[in-house]
């Protein structure tokens, strides 16, 4: 986007020798001038939207937090995308390599695209690492070395972790010299979910060993044994695991189940874990813990065959690069008659905690809920951060209806449908479901009550571009 007046103002600042010699010192010593420039740029790039007072305060708090990181609580609807964009731009102008982590791939792509024009006005390079093409993703890490400004990369936490492992352990030189002579800074969306709820989550780079293919016969026999077992309560499962383990070992010793001798120790070590996974797979349901469908990227199918796609129960997003370990993936493939994959071995790994701690005092985050005092104390000790609770930009005008409870599933669905039909006469209705299964059940119940299908926008999977649909037609006339 070209804006002669803005470009003149921008060039007057950033062509200065003081900025070229030390961008960070110059920006921090001229904060009022830089913030004025950022707000002006955002207003040009996003007419008629301008930052609100609370959003400016959020930016100022991030800037003033020098010796520690900062996690801010800001309510839903207060414009986190704008705050993330302003903060990323400020630290990129300081010369930092800025990484922005979202809770899923779709939000990362959307966040970068919404801020791209704003970044371009400030002559900042931005990109995301959410493409199916690794070469395109890796290009996002390569800044223009002729400028002192840093560049900005959006992505989900797993994508950054994978690239770190590939770069540092497999020597793929993904980052080039991006982090070599620059400070690095991490800005996190939904920080409580990733830093607290998922602090123990670990990303592995796995390796498939061809010889483990010979375990297929064992997996089939394990699955058959688990299906034959009667389980009346969860307390019985431990004893069932012991019994099946003993039975399988005897069959392996007697050559009734073939296992190569060089795999004996490995099988002995993993057998009980596999049996436990088989019991888990037996009770796991499609459209709850996972979906059975064709993976999508940017709304396009990336495979021809339906496969098991892990669903994150916290966010409802599909985890295309995630596979369950300890045989669980294989037992679900047997359950749903998919092609049986080979059990993989974990080679190198990194936890969420370790990843976030790499950024030291340059760790910044936003969330709708910071949690209890105990949670905040835990985060402060773990990541060396402090906290801020920001007020809303205006007084909220809403009230809560009395809660209703149903004892039967059919009554629960009926109540939701009747209440929705009543409320939609005067306002739009949003129904947030626990899983895909509930989405389908409520959809069918609304249809049963006579709601026309074309008046219901159903968001069932990643890649369903519901936001674009509502931009074109925000509500339905009744």
Model segments located where?
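Conserved P-loop NTPase motor core
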Residues: 1-478
């Amino acid at each position: 986007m070209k804006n002669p007046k803005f470009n003149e103002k921008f060039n007057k600042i950033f062509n200065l020798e003081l900025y070229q010699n030390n961008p960070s010192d110059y920006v921090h010593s001229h904060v009022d001038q830089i913030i004025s420039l950022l707000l002006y740029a955002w207003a040009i790039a996003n007419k008629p939207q301008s930052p609100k007072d609370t959003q400016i305060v959020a930016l100022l708090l991030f800037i003033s937090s020098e010796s520690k990181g900062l996690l801010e609580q800001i309510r839903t609807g207060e414009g986190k995308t704008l705050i993330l964009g302003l903060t990323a731009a400020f630290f990129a102008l300081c010369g930092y390599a800025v990484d922005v982590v979202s809770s899923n791939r779709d939000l990362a792509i959307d966040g970068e695209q919404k801020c791209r024009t704003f970044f371009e006005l400030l002559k900042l390079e931005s990109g995301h690492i959410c493409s199916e093409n690794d070469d395109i993703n890796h290009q996002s890490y390569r800044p223009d070395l002729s400028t002192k400004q840093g560049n900005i990369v959006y992505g989900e936490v797993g994508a950054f972790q994978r690239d770190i492992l590939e770069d540092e352990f497999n020597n793929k030189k993904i980052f080039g010299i991006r982090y070599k002579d620059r400070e690095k800074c991490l800005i996190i969306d939904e920080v409580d979910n990733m830093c607290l709820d998922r602090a123990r989550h670990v990303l592995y780079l796995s390796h498939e060993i061809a010889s483990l293919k010979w375990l297929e016969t064992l997996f089939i026999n394990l699955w058959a044994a688990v299906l034959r077992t009667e389980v009346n309560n969860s307390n019985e499962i431990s004893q069932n695991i012991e019994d099946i383990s003993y039975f399988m070992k005897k069959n392996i010793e007697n050559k009734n189940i073939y296992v190569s001798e060089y795999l004996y120790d490995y099988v002995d070590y993993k057998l009980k874990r596999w049996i436990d996974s088989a019991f888990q797979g037996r009770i796991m349901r499609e459209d709850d813990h996972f979906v059975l469908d064709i993976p999508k990227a940017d709304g396009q199918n990336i495979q021809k065959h339906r496969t098991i796609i892990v669903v994150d129960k916290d966010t409802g997003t599909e985890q295309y690069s995630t596979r369950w370990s300890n045989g669980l993936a294989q037992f679900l493939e047997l359950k749903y008659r998919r092609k049986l994959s080979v059990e993989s071995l974990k080679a190198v790994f990194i936890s969420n905690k370790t990843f976030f701690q790499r950024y030291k005092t340059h760790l910044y985050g936003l969330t709708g809920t910071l949690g209890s005092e105990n949670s905040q104390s835990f985060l402060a000790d773990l990541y060396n951060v402090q906290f801020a609770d920001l007020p809303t930009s205006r007084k909220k005008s809403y009230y809560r209806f009395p809660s209703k409870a149903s004892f039967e599933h059919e009554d629960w669905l009926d109540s939701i449908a009747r209440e929705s039909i009543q409320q939609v006469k005067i306002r739009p209705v949003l129904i947030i479901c626990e899983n895909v299964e509930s989405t389908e059940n409520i959809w069918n119940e609304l249809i049963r009550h006579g709601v026309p299908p074309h008046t219901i926008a159903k968001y069932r999977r990643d890649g369903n571009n519901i936001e674009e649909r509502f931009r074109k037609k925000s509500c339905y006339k009744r």
